[in-house]
């Protein structure tokens, strides 16, 4: 017996008249007056289910087939035939239907045959991948993930696994989740009455990582080209459509590289992964274009064919001032541009993806390379039409004296970062990198308006279910 994924049958990979068995779940059942049932069976391998045509002469037709409801799991054996129905070229002429698992109560099944709101689906995150929309998101997410790994592999990068538990704050924002095994009901205290983290598991205060960048720098300064791709954590009390407490980051780090080098890398990577998803997940993208965002496909096609614009932060501020727009947030040199500013630049002024470079140092992290003007750093943001910032990066400060001065200026004790300073003490090199928020990328591709709907189990303030 040959078990076949539904995608192989529908794509014509298997020959007509061959006998196969598909395994999956019932999306719908329709019965005709002629004594034939039509089962829509999906297995998640592609967007569409396959239609199984079931005759009433099967021995379990009355006792089981006619009782199948949405969500029941089945194995259907039959012959692949050309389909006269619209929408797919092939269907299955069933010779056997085996029920693997029943839905106990079809009336109360949370994923019953009806369209559910996105908000409702968040409440049943353990069942929502069974829906068209979240199933499509999952396949697109996988495609993008595989394409990212493939891109860096082809470019000669080494993937490194950055630690999730750290004693360093890469962003200097202090919005970190503490990791501790201390008994909260009986905390050890030091002589000053503060919690004594010397008694904790790691012998010091530790946190969940906000970025793998600092660790990636250590490997870039030995392997030349590396990247991390893993979960990061931010304890921001933000209830927006763009924020999660747990999310995934793609962070390449390149030795002997400048800001311009990683700006080009960012453009090449985004175009590569968008071309991949357009080629590999067209069925899912067509669904998003029909149900979620009409521009889902054309936006990616235009992105891939566009030349990225580049502009200095100072010039970008002047463009915003000269726009005549009444922005919600005032535009002045030194601000951290808001989403409305970013989207104006990408969507209305440049009408293309744009890289903004050389930001004021006072709004950027300690590790960014200071420019000769003493006011700005070699930092960049990639702004995409439709979403705004999608990538943030910089050239790293490779000069030890300037790095030390910057840390002191920002209230960071250089001694606490001795291992990071060693990279500058022993064979320092110019190096650069960036961070891509993976959920924002998936949101951009699918048109899903909230990042909570593009990660399997979203972690947000007051919510850590499942």
Swiss-Prot record:
A Gene Ontology BP annotation from the UniProt entry: asparaginyl-tRNA aminoacylation
Catalysed conversion reaction: tRNA(Asn) + L-asparagine + ATP = L-asparaginyl-tRNA(Asn) + AMP + diphosphate + H(+)
Gene Ontology MF terms in the entry: asparagine-tRNA ligase activity; ATP binding; nucleic acid binding
EC number: 6.1.1.22
Matches recorded under CDD domains: AsxRS_core (cd00776), EcAsnRS_like_N (cd04318)
InterPro entries: Aa-tRNA-synt_II (IPR004364), aa-tRNA-synth_II (IPR006195), aa-tRNA-synth_II/BPL/LPL (IPR045864), Asn-tRNA-ligase (IPR004522), Asp/Asn-tRNA-synth_IIb (IPR002312), NA-bd_OB-fold (IPR012340), NA-bd_OB_tRNA (IPR004365)
Enzyme's top EC category: ligase
Name of the protein in its database record: Asparagine--tRNA ligase
Native species: Aliivibrio fischeri (strain ATCC 700601 / ES114) (Vibrio fischeri)
Classification lineage: Bacteria, Pseudomonadati, Pseudomonadota, Gammaproteobacteria, Vibrionales
């Amino acid at each position: 017996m040959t078990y076949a994924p539904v995608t192989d049958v529908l794509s014509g990979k298997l020959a007509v008249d061959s006998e196969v068995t598909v395994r999956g779940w019932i999306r719908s059942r329709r019965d005709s007056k002629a004594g034939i049932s039509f089962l829509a069976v999906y297995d998640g391998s592609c967007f569409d289910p396959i239609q199984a045509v079931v005759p009433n002469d099967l021995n379990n037709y009355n006792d089981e087939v006619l009782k199948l409801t949405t969500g029941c799991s089945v194995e259907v054996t039959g012959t692949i035939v050309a389909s006269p129905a619209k929408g797919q070229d092939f269907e299955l002429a069933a010779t056997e239907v085996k029920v693997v698992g029943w839905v106990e109560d079809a009336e109360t099944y949370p994923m019953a045959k009806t369209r559910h709101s996105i908000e409702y689906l968040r409440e049943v995150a353990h069942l929502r991948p069974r829906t068209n929309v979240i199933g499509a998101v999952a396949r697109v997410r996988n495609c993008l993930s595989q394409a990212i790994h493939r891109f860096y592999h082809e470019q000669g990068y080494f993937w490194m696994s950055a630690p999730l538990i750290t004693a360093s704050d890469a962003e200097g924002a202090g919005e970190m989740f503490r990791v501790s095994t201390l008994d909260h009901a009986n905390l050890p205290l030091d002589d000053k009455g503060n919690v004594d983290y010397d008694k904790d598991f790691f012998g010091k205060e530790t946190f969940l990582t906000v970025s793998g960048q600092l660790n990636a720098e250590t490997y870039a300064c030995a392997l030349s080209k590396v990247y991390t791709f893993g979960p990061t954590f931010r304890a921001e009390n933000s209830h927006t459509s763009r924020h999660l407490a747990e999310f995934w980051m793609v962070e390449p780090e390149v030795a002997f590289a400048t800001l311009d080098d990683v700006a080009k890398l960012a453009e090449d990577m985004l175009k590569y992964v968008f071309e991949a998803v357009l080629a590999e997940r067209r069925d899912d993208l067509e669904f998003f274009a029909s149900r979620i965002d009409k521009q889902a496909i054309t936006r990616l096609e235009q992105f891939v064919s566009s030349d990225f614009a580049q502009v200095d932060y100072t010039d970008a501020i002047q463009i915003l001032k000269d726009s005549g727009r009444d922005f919600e947030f005032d535009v002045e040199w030194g601000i951290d541009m808001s989403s409305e500013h970013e989207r104006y630049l990408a969507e209305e002024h440049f009408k293309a993806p744009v890289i903004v470079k050389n930001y004021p140092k006072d709004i950027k992290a300690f590790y960014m390379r200071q420019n000769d003007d003493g006011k700005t750093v070699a930092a960049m943001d990639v702004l995409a039409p439709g979403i705004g910032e999608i990538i943030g990066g910089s050239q790293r400060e490779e000069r030890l004296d300037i790095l030390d001065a910057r840390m002191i200026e920002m209230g960071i004790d250089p001694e606490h970062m001795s291992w990071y300073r060693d990279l500058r003490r022993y064979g320092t090199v110019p190096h650069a990198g960036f961070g891509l928020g993976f959920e924002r990328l998936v949101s951009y591709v699918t048109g899903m308006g909230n990042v909570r709907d593009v990660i399997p189990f979203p972690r947000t303030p007051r919510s850590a279910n499942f």
